[in-house]
A protein has these predicted regions:
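Active-site environment of divalent metal-dependent phosphoester hydrolases
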Residues: 9-14, 38-41, 65-70, 111, ...
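Acidic, His/Gly-rich catalytic cores of divalent-metal-dependent hydrolytic chemistry
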Residues: 168-253
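Charged helix-capping and loop-helix junction motifs
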Residues: 44-46, 133-139, 175-177
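Core catalytic region of metal-dependent phosphoesterases/phosphodiesterases
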Residues: 3-100
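His/acidic metal-ligating clusters that form di-metal
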Residues: 26-29, 95-168
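Short active-site oxyanion
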Residues: 56-59, 151-152, 221
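Beta-strand-turn-beta hairpins that frame and shape the catalytic cleft
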Residues: 1-3, 110-117, 186-192
Length: 253
């Protein structure tokens, strides 16, 4: 069974809770869909955990926040710095050269069985498109399933859980999944799932998100996992990063 986790955002408490839940649920493989760092208070701890998973065979991708952290700092033209760059600057001071080397060698997409995994959109992974509309989902799914052996694609980046299914009669349809309820998926159908965010949900529910997929039975389950998100928010405040990062975690938005 494949556990799919995305947008960890340096939130070690959320990651540990999701990994414990996945292991208890029978996960035997792991795919980490990028944005390991950014916003959260524990980038080094999260990277250490992910690197250990990678050493055991997990697939790990690079996201836009990972890319920004290892890029050259953005030059100031005034006193205003985008919040993403504020986060990247802070993160650079918290991680090691070994962490940076690990991030820079990560791919943007990978194939796991009949699944393509990608942080943003399969049609242009480096442009960081949000797969948050039927149109964007269609472009992503089309690009993914043009690859030999790919039937479905798993995506991160939007911090929400969604399921898109291509019907023979109605074309691509969108569903909002119910946590813990399995989707039994007919063979030969193409579909797309956005797996949500482990470390920074944005749908009004502060619980961590991830998904489990059993390729043998073609059953997909989206999960929400309780963890101490208020302690994680307090750690952000203590880190000296913008308070907005903490309040967003507190509200799940």
């Amino acid at each position: 069974m494949l556990a799919l986790l995305s947008d960890l955002h340096a939130n070690a408490r959320a990651l540990d809770a999701c990994l414990a839940h996945a292991r208890a649920s029978g996960a035997t493989q792991y795919a980490i869909l990028g944005d390991l760092v950014g916003y959260g208070p524990e980038p080094a701890a999260v990277l250490d955990t992910v690197m250990a998973l990678a050493a055991e065979g997990a697939v790990v991708l690079r996201g836009n926040h990972d890319e920004a952290t290892c890029a050259a700092p953005v030059a100031r033209i005034n006193d205003d710095i985008p919040t993403d760059e504020v986060s990247a600057q802070w993160t650079r001071g918290q991680i090691t050269a070994q962490h940076r080397r690990f991030i820079t060698q990560l791919p943007l997409s990978a194939q796991v069985g009949s699944s393509l995994v990608v942080h943003a959109s399969a049609d242009a992974p480096m442009e960081w498109h949000y797969v948050d509309t039927l149109h964007r989902a269609e472009l992503c799914l089309k690009a993914a399933t043009e690859r030999p052996g790919v039937q479905q694609v798993f995506v991160g980046h939007i911090h929400r859980q969604r399921f898109y299914y291509r019907s023979s009669r109605s074309g691509l349809m969108e569903f909002e999944p119910v946590p813990g309820v399995a989707f039994p998926i007919p063979a030969q159908r193409h579909w797309l799932a956005t797996v949500g965010s482990v470390g920074q949900p944005r749908d009004g529910d502060p619980r961590a998100m991830y998904a489990l997929y059993d390729e043998a039975t073609r059953r997909l389950v989206f999960h929400r996992v309780e963890y101490d998100h208020l302690a994680a928010a307090a750690a952000i405040r203590a880190s000296g990063q913008p308070v907005f990062f903490a309040t967003r975690l507190e509200s799940g938005r």
